[in-house]
């Protein structure tokens, strides 16, 4: 199996730097995608309660001949469940057919609802109970993160954010690093590469390294120290996205991709997304 890099989280646990995302995939698509990914060599799978496909992940894991301690499974607490994380986690574990998850993330801060600090305290307790190995967040901006640290004394191990060449969030990435929080990129290919894969620097590097534009962008994430979870349900694409460990981008090449940043957000703004209650 291809040796892949691991990121050491500040709690001491190791997380594969490259994983499979399963957003917008049906249960059946997810089961097939995860099975293929495990066959290819992936060991990290990222799902969420709101994706409504945790059962598909669970079925694939159950059928796979991969030891549990080799896997790294992430799921997420949805906004409506921030008032009852334990029940939400138990439901997720049942669907995943697991005794614990490796990483449990608060999916959005949902600042209007303002339950994320109390939810975080509950995640700390669930971790102590052994139902979660590591705890983290998604889509948290610096004030949200600072408030968690100020009010609970415990920082997330991971902050999963929208991050791709068009939205690099360098200030947030740097702040995370300063506070020993790993940064994980969702939508790492900018939702199928629109506006990215046709950039001259991406096409030039793809030709130079005999790789696809997607592989160049994934390698950019890896060489930037980011955890990356490209989504695919296509077997050939799942394999292609994993075949990125036989080359590295040079410093000046990384810098050239950095210049593509234009602050283009494709997903919701975390400051306003969530409940209106």
UniProtKB/Swiss-Prot annotation:
Pfam families documented for this protein: Aldo_ket_red
Keyword Calcium: no
Catalytic activity: hydroxyacetone + NADP(+) = methylglyoxal + NADPH + H(+)
SUPFAM superfamilies per record: NAD(P)-linked oxidoreductase
Residues reported to bind NADP(+): 187-241
Single Gene Ontology BP annotation: L-ascorbic acid biosynthetic process
Alphabetical keyword list: Cytoplasm, NADP, Oxidoreductase
PANTHER family: 2,5-DIKETO-D-GLUCONIC ACID REDUCTASE (PTHR43827), NADP-DEPENDENT OXIDOREDUCTASE DOMAIN-CONTAINING PROTEIN (PTHR43827:SF3)
Protein family per UniProt: Belongs to the aldo/keto reductase family.
Entry-linked NCBIfam families: PRK11565.1
Free-text function comment from the UniProt entry: Aldo-keto reductase that significantly contributes to cellular methylglyoxal detoxification by catalyzing the NADPH-dependent conversion of methylglyoxal to acetol.
Name of the featured protein: Methylglyoxal reductase DkgA
The organism of origin for this protein: Yersinia pestis
